Amino acid sequence: MTNISLDKLVTESRNENTKDIDRVETLEMLKMINDEDKKVAEAVEKELINIAKAVDKIGESFLNGGRLIYVGAGTSGRLGVLDASECPPTYGVSYDLVRGIIAGGESAMFKAREGAEDSKKLCIKDLKNVNFGENDILVGIAASGRTPYVIGGLEYANGIGATTISVTCNPESEMSKIANISIAPVVGPEAITGSTRMKAGTAQKMVLNMLSTGAMVKTGKVYGNLMVDLKATNEKLVERAKRIVMQATGSKREQVEKILKETNFDVKLSIFMIESSLDKIKAKEILDKNKGYIVEAIKEIS
């Protein structure tokens, strides 16, 4: 256990703006919470330079065969698992490319296992279980910036030469000093003292969204602002796939449905076939040559 006193942490401080939250009407209570929530986006904005550095590192790692691994305990761990689990259906990547590891294992997603966060060795074991290597990126998430489980992971990753990123909500935390890149949106005291699932959790979610989304954009998973590597695995996503191709190409539904059927609902390939007027085999060859970047593939044939 680290020796940082909790009373020195911003996230554990008492919020003077909400000290009467238990004595006001419901609407006033919610206004208090909402006023605090408004501070979150501003805190994240102040960290954009550091977030950009992290996105560039993650994108570079992806292009070189690396992965993005999140580690955290409690709410922080759950947020990592949540962000990771959304990447395959949204961007068509493997479930191994972005992974979330929570202290205490899968059961900790649904039932708190708070004691698991106190072990540095447990995180090292968890990282070894997923074959974490020097080409991978480790993002350690903890509102306090002092969680032993996460610190153990960051230290291990540093030791094998991997890039490390910390996402915390306390300035000058131990994690911030260990990680290669520190992201620390300081959201201030919580509406309910110490309840870091609130503002801190929201800030962490926003940062993780930026990290994964930014890296996917950097690696050609987005064309314009369209998710062109979407996997059409249900009726809603089938319709979304059709709309994406229509929006990207300006083509009518009938043509889009025909091309999507030909490509087995490969959205990116369908778009490039329409934009290039090439057949499936030639279009795929050029796309593959350009590592899936539609813009670069179009430049090649222009």
From Swiss-Prot:
PANTHER family for the chain: GLUCOKINASE REGULATORY PROTEIN
Active site: E86 (proton donor), E117
Lipoprotein in keyword set: no
Subunit structure: Homodimer.
PROSITE patterns: GCKR, SIS
Stated role: Specifically catalyzes the cleavage of the D-lactyl ether substituent of MurNAc 6-phosphate, producing GlcNAc 6-phosphate and D-lactate.
Enzyme class at the top of the EC tree: lyase
InterPro entries: Etherase_MurQ, Glucokinase_regulatory_CS, MURQ/GCKR, SIS_dom, SIS_dom_sf
Name of the molecule in the record: N-acetylmuramic acid 6-phosphate etherase
Miscellaneous comment in the UniProt entry for this protein: A lyase-type mechanism (elimination/hydration) is suggested for the cleavage of the lactyl ether bond of MurNAc 6-phosphate, with the formation of an alpha,beta-unsaturated aldehyde intermediate with (E)-stereochemistry, followed by the syn addition of water to give product.
Catalysed reactions listed for this entry: N-acetyl-D-muramate 6-phosphate + H2O = N-acetyl-D-glucosamine 6-phosphate + (R)-lactate
Pathway field: Amino-sugar metabolism; N-acetylmuramate degradation
GO BP annotation list: amino sugar catabolic process; N-acetylmuramic acid catabolic process; peptidoglycan turnover
EC number: 4.2.1.126
GO molecular function: carbohydrate derivative binding; carbon-oxygen lyase activity; ether hydrolase activity
Keywords, comma-separated and alphabetical: Carbohydrate metabolism, Lyase
Keyword Lyase: yes
The SIS domain, residue ranges: 58-221
Gene3D superfamilies assigned: 1.10.8.1080, Glucose-6-phosphate isomerase like protein, domain 1
CDD domains: SIS_Etherase (cd05007)
Family membership noted in the UniProt record: Belongs to the GCKR-like family. MurNAc-6-P etherase subfamily.
Family matches, as SUPFAM superfamilies: SIS domain
